[in-house]
Regions:
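N-terminal secretory signal peptides that target proteins for export/translocation
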Residues: 1-5
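Short, functionally important structural connectors and interaction interfaces within domains
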Residues: 6, 14, 30-33
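Positively charged, low-complexity intrinsically disordered regions
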Residues: 7-8, 131
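Bacterial N-terminal signal peptides
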Residues: 8-20
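Hydrophobic small-molecule pocket/channel-lining residues, especially in calycin-type beta-barrels
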Residues: 24-191
């Protein structure tokens, strides 16, 4: 047996040995079509935005401005998205650096989203669904003061060049909403 034939047989054996368990446990199963709904996030982005405030602070200073970057990539298995959003205030002081993991659940027919802020720790888990031309993400949690809230985050005006993110907040189980509590305008800077 020649060296070439011997190597070809070994390679054939190894490929079969590695791929057989993958096929058996379903790891090579195709992603659900919905697993592409957050693909608009993939790339590098420049972020500008503002936070809604009221009362004396708003009268004196106006709405606090935010600036930052957002980068996102598909997970290695192709079933989800990982992304990192970094925001600073107008003076350049870091306010938030959040790493998100987004994966589509076929069983629940929605996106499951986990986030961790470098300054605040773990964020409440969220879910998201495509609704017409937007992605709608919802979550609930408790403020540091112990006040329960709900968030709904709209990803709107989605184009290859950018999108808008608007976050609403409710402190009464969704009966009333503070709309536009935070607004981010996101523009693509790279792939």
């Amino acid at each position: 047996m020649t060296l070439f034939v011997r190597r070809a047989l070994i390679l054939t054996f190894l490929v079969g040995w590695v791929t057989a368990p993958l096929a058996a446990d379903g790891a090579s199963a195709a992603a659900a079509p919905e697993a592409r709904q957050f693909d608009f996030l993939v790339g590098q982005w420049q972020v500008s935005g503002e936070v809604k405030v009221s009362g004396l602070v708003a009268m004196i200073h106006g709405r606090p401005k935010l600036a930052g970057s957002w980068k996102a990539w598909r997970t290695a298995d192709g079933q989800g998205i990982e992304d990192e959003l970094t925001l600073a205030d107008a003076s350049g002081t870091p306010r938030s650096t959040v790493h998100f993991t987004r994966s589509f659940s076929r069983e629940e027919n929605c996106w499951k989203i986990m986030g961790r802020d470098a300054y605040k720790g773990a964020l409440p888990p969220a879910t998201a669904r495509r609704q017409g031309d937007e992605m709608l993400m919802t979550s609930s949690g408790t403020t540091p003061e112990g006040k329960h809230y709900r968030n709904r985050t709209h990803y709107l005006a989605i184009t290859p060049a950018g999108f808008r993110m608007v976050q609403d907040r409710s402190y009464d189980e969704g009966k009333t909403w503070d709309t536009g509590a935070m607004t981010l305008d996101v523009r693509r800077t790279g792939n």
